[in-house]
C-alpha cells in the first residue's frame, strides 16, 4: 500500500460534558513523564459520568444509585500490532470497519492515542474466542501497537522487533487498564491467542515475559514448575490419549480447540499461537517437551 502523499491535517481533542451535572468532565488524557515513565490519569480520578434516560413527563431519580449488583464490561485486554506505520495506522483505525481503544505509536515520545472511549465497543478482535466466550469486542479493551509485523513470508518469517521505549508505553498503559478493571493475568492476550491461524499478532518478538516481570501484566509460568514437568513428558506424541490431554489443557488455559485426539488445523494453530506467546524461540506447532511442560506449568499456576 502506497502511503506517500497522505497528509493528516488535524487531530481533534474531544471534551465531554456530564449530561446530568454542572461540572465539566476533564478530557481523558495520558499525561507526561516522571523518570521516563508514561503516567496515565486514573479512571477513579475523574468524575463519574452517568448515562440515563431523560423523560419530559417523569423524573428519573438517582436516590438509590448505584446498585451494588453490577460489574465491568471489560474482562479481557487484547494486544495487536498494526503491520503499518503510525500515520497510516491512525488513518485506518479512525475510519470504517476497524478500530481500537488505544494506539501506541513507534515514536520515542510520551504520547499514546486514545481512539475509542473505554465504555464503547471497539472493533479490534473480530471473530474470536477465549475461555469459551465468542466475539471479544464486547468484553475487551484493544491496544494496537505500531509495528510492521512479518516483513517476510510464512515460510521465511522476518518479524519486526519492538523498541524498549515503545514497550514502556505498552507496559504502563496495560498496567493501568488491568488494575482498574481487575483483569485476570490469563485474560491478557494477543490477537493470535483469540484467533489462532487467522491472526499472528503481536507476533513472536513481542516481549510477553518482560511485560510480566517489569509491569506485572499478563501471565507467565514459573521456571521451577516447567523443569519439574519436563521429565514427565510422555514422548508418545501420536497417541490419541496424549493429544486429547494436550487439547484439554489448551482449552483449560483459554484456547478454542476441540478434544478429538487429532492434531487438526485448529489445534495446530492454537499450539503455534501458544508457542509464539510463551516459547517464541520455536513455534512450529509441535508439542515438544518444553511446550508441554510450559502448558502444564501455566495451568498449575492459574487454573489449579
Regions found by a protein language model. Name each.
Residues 18-19:
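C-terminal motif of bacterial Sec signal peptides marking the signal peptidase cleavage site
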Residues 30-184:
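Active-site-adjacent loop/helix surface patches within enzyme catalytic domains
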Residues 1-10:
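Bacterial N-terminal signal peptides that target proteins for export
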Residues 103-104, 204-229:
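Acidic, His- and aromatic-enriched active-site or binding-groove loops in soluble protein domains
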Residues 183-198:
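Acidic/histidine-rich, metal-coordinating catalytic segments
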Residues 73, 97, 157-168, 202, ...:
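Soluble non-cytosolic domains of exported or imported proteins
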Residues 65, 89-90, 129-132, 154-165, ...:
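Second-shell loop/turn segments in exported
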Amino acid at each position: 500500500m502506497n502511503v506517500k502523499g497522505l497528509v493528516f491535517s488535524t487531530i481533534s481533542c474531544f471534551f465531554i460534558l456530564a449530561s446530568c451535572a454542572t461540572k465539566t468532565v476533564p478530557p481523558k488524557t495520558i499525561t507526561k513523564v516522571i523518570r521516563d515513565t508514561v503516567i496515565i490519569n486514573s479512571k477513579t480520578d475523574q468524575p463519574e459520568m452517568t448515562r440515563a434516560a431523560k423523560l419530559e413527563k417523569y423524573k428519573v431519580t438517582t436516590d438509590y444509585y448505584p446498585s451494588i449488583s453490577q460489574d465491568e464490561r471489560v474482562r479481557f485486554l487484547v494486544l495487536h500490532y498494526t503491520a503499518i506505520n503510525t500515520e497510516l495506522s491512525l488513518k485506518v483505525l479512525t475510519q470504517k470497519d476497524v478500530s481500537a481503544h488505544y494506539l501506541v505509536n513507534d515514536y520515542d515520545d510520551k504520547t499514546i492515542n486514545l481512539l475509542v472511549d473505554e465504555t464503547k465497543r471497539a472493533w479490534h478482535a473480530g471473530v474470536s474466542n477465549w475461555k469459551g466466550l465468542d466475539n471479544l469486542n464486547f468484553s475487551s479493551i484493544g491496544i494496537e501497537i505500531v509495528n510492521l509485523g512479518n516483513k517476510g513470508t510464512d515460510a521465511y518469517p522476518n518479524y519486526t522487533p519492538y523498541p524498549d521505549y515503545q514497550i514502556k508505553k505498552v507496559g504502563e498503559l496495560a498496567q493501568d487498564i488491568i488494575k482498574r478493571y481487575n483483569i485476570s493475568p490469563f485474560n491478557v492476550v494477543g490477537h493470535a491467542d483469540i484467533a489462532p491461524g487467522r491472526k499472528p499478532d503481536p507476533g513472536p518478538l513481542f516481549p510477553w515475559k518482560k511485560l510480566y516481570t517489569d509491569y506485572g501484566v499478563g501471565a507467565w509460568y514459573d521456571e521451577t514448575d516447567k523443569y519439574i514437568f519436563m521429565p514427565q513428558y510422555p514422548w508418545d506424541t501420536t497417541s490419541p490419549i496424549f493429544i486429547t490431554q494436550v487439547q484439554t489443557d489448551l482449552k483449560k488455559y483459554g484456547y478454542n480447540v476441540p478434544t478429538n485426539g487429532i492434531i487438526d488445523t485448529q489445534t495446530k494453530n492454537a499450539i503455534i499461537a501458544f508457542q509464539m506467546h510463551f516459547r517464541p524461540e520455536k513455534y512450529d506447532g509441535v508439542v515438544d517437551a518444553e511446550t508441554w511442560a510450559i502448558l502444564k506449568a501455566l495451568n498449575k499456576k492459574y487454573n489449579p
